[in-house]
From Swiss-Prot:
Changing E403Q: Loss of regulation of str-2 expression in AWC neurons. Belongs to the nuclear hormone receptor family. NR0 subfamily. Keywords: Chemotaxis, Cytoplasm, DNA-binding, Metal-binding, Nucleus, Olfaction, Receptor, Repressor, Sensory transduction, Transcription, Transcription regulation, Zinc, Zinc-finger. This is Nuclear hormone receptor family member odr-7. GO terms for biological process: negative adaptation of signaling pathway; positive chemotaxis; positive regulation of transcription by RNA polymerase II; regulation of transcription by RNA polymerase II; sensory perception of smell. Changing E47D: In strain: CB4857. Required for the function of one pair of chemosensory neurons called AWA neurons that are involved in chemotaxis to volatile odorants. Acts in a pathway that specifies olfactory neuronal fate. Regulates the transcription of olfactory signaling molecules such as odr-10 that specify AWA neuron identity and function. Represses the expression in AWA neurons of factors such as str-2 which specify AWC neuron identity. Induction: Down-regulated by the cyanotoxin microcystin-LR. Pfam families: zf-C4 (PF00105). The gene is odr-7. InterPro entries: HNF4-like_DBD, NR5-like, Znf_hrmn_rcpt, Znf_NHR/GATA. It is found in: Nucleus; Cytoplasm, Perinuclear region. Heterodimer with a partner that confers DNA binding capacity or a nuclear hormone receptor whose DNA binding it inhibits. Disruption phenotype: Worms are defective in chemotaxis to the volatile odorants diacetyl and pyrazine and weakly defective in chemotaxis to 2,4,5-trimethylthiazole, but respond normally to the odorants benzaldehyde, butanone, and isoamyl alcohol.
Length: 457
């Protein structure tokens, strides 16, 4: 039984339950007869039903509340014309000034500010998207009172302006104009030119470096960089450095010889190398009368400051084998990196295996060029340019010892049975008067066709 109310509300019949509440009397338990209640109670129950119904119908009727569906769109800026042009330093949210970022709408739908699109400079300027780099002194100096321009440091695009005075470089890179008078005139004119424009230049730390030309830097590496003292002017220090560099150019270059005693390792006893030519400059004030190659080597010192003595033999003549590296390449083939000491010399694994096979197999080689093979490296096809006879000769010349090679008959994995000591002479070293018990005892003999434990009576 449904009775319409005067106010448009519905009053249900007695006993009808909506959830756990009765529509008529708001009882919490099921019942067959309701107790008539007050009319405002029916109004309360009707309002509760309407509220519950609105919550259930909200996802289907959400046009006035959420026009975007389940997720709000990204902030695209206010429509043009809604806001006036304000201070450019403030956040600009005009739709016409926004930069598009379509991937941010998909991954971050509920975030208004799209973080990866901002640079660090824009973050410190109120997240302004169209922010350009302003005056380095900031926007607080852009008024009418600050119309003049402030002098800045010169741009350090090259190393010429680094930590030096703001003037043209006083030294010319041309090696022909190295006369002291020309350099002094250049320095004086440069100092005069720089003193005229010193008022509009900021103060910087003045550090002078001794200038070395290409011909001087090649052999002189012991000159330290010196800073100009405070009580000394920069022009005086520049002239002193020029005179010092000119004196160093006139002095002959001196280099020291390495000691003839060399050690392969730190824990190895030093020994006299056969391929090192001993030289003592205190006993020979004049150059030795040796080959022209050795004199030419002494006359032109190398860049690294030492002479490779391995290029010369005991007579001072240049050797045919010239290793490119002193201790890193194989001393036999000269083209492979040495991986250690093999039989007393620093060689590669291939040359060590060749030497071991030749000695253990007792091989003999003959050179077809009458021992004139002088290149142990490989050619373009991979074959060696030296024969096996000259290669073996080279192994012996550099100091590989044949007695260090283990022969096949002494190897553990060889096929021949080991040599055994007879039983009656086994204890002779400990007991000289030892005799086996029994006069009929015979010594044990071992043959290759019989078992080692077989005894003959």
């Amino acid at each position: 039984m449904i009775v319409p109310d005067t106010e448009g509300l519905l009053i249900y019949s007695y006993g009808l339950m909506y959830g756990s509440y009765c529509m008529a009397c708001q009882m919490l338990i099921p019942h067959f007869q309701c107790i008539p209640g007050i009319f405002p109670n029916f109004r309360i129950s009707t309002e509760l039903i309407k509220t519950m119904t609105d919550k259930l119908e909200q996802p289907n009727n959400n046009v006035p509340q959420q026009p975007w569906g389940p997720f709000p769109p990204a902030f695209g800026g206010r429509p043009s014309g809604e806001q006036t042009d304000g201070n450019p330093g403030e956040f600009d949210n005009d739709a016409a000034h926004q930069q598009t970022a379509p991937f941010m709408t998909h991954f971050f739908p509920r975030i208004g500010l799209q973080f990866p699109d901002f640079t660090e400079y824009q973050r410190f300027n109120g997240f302004q998207r169209n922010a350009f780099f302003p005056n380095p002194f900031g926007s607080q100096f852009t008024g009418q009172a600050f119309a003049q321009s402030f002098p800045l440091h010169n741009s350090m695009t090259t190393m010429d302006g680094f930590n030096l005075t703001h003037a043209p470089h006083p030294f010319s890179t041309n090696t022909n104009s190295t006369k002291p008078k020309d350099i002094e005139n250049t320095v004086q004119s440069t100092i005069k030119h720089s003193s005229e424009n010193i008022q509009d230049k900021p103060p910087v730390l003045s550090v002078e470096y001794p200038v070395k030309y290409d011909s001087e830097l090649k052999f002189d590496a012991n000159v330290d960089f010196t800073a100009v003292p405070k009580q000394e002017s920069s022009d005086d220090s520049t002239l002193k450095n020029l005179k010092k560099s000119d004196q160093q150019l006139q002095q002959p270059q001196q280099f020291t010889f390495p000691p003839p005693l060399l050690a392969e390792k730190s824990f190895e006893q030093p020994r006299m190398r056969e391929d090192v030519l001993p030289f003592h400059p205190q006993f020979y004030p004049a150059p030795l009368d040796m080959g022209t190659n050795f004199k030419q080597e002494m006359r032109t010192p190398p860049i690294d400051g030492h002479i490779d003595y391995r290029k010369f033999d005991a007579s001072g003549k240049r050797m045919e084998f010239q290793p490119p590296g002193a201790l890193h390449d194989c001393q036999v083939c000269l083209s492979t990196h040495a991986n250690g000491l093999h039989f007393g010399a620093r060689t590669c694994a291939a040359c060590a295996a060749f030497f071991r096979r030749t000695i253990s197999d007792d091989k003999r080689y003959v050179c077809k060029r009458n021992q004139r093979c002088n290149n142990a490296s490989r050619d373009g096809t991979g074959y060696r340019k030296i024969c096996r006879s000259c290669r073996m000769k080279r192994c012996l010349e550099i100091g590989m010892l044949p007695e260090n090679v283990q022969h096949k008959r002494n190897r553990r994995d060889s096929g021949s049975p080991p040599r055994k000591t007879p039983f009656d002479t086994f204890f002779n070293g400990f007991y000289p008067s030892f005799q086996p018990s029994g006069s009929a005892a015979q010594p044990i003999t071992v043959s290759s066709s019989e078992s080692p434990r077989h005894t003959t009576n």
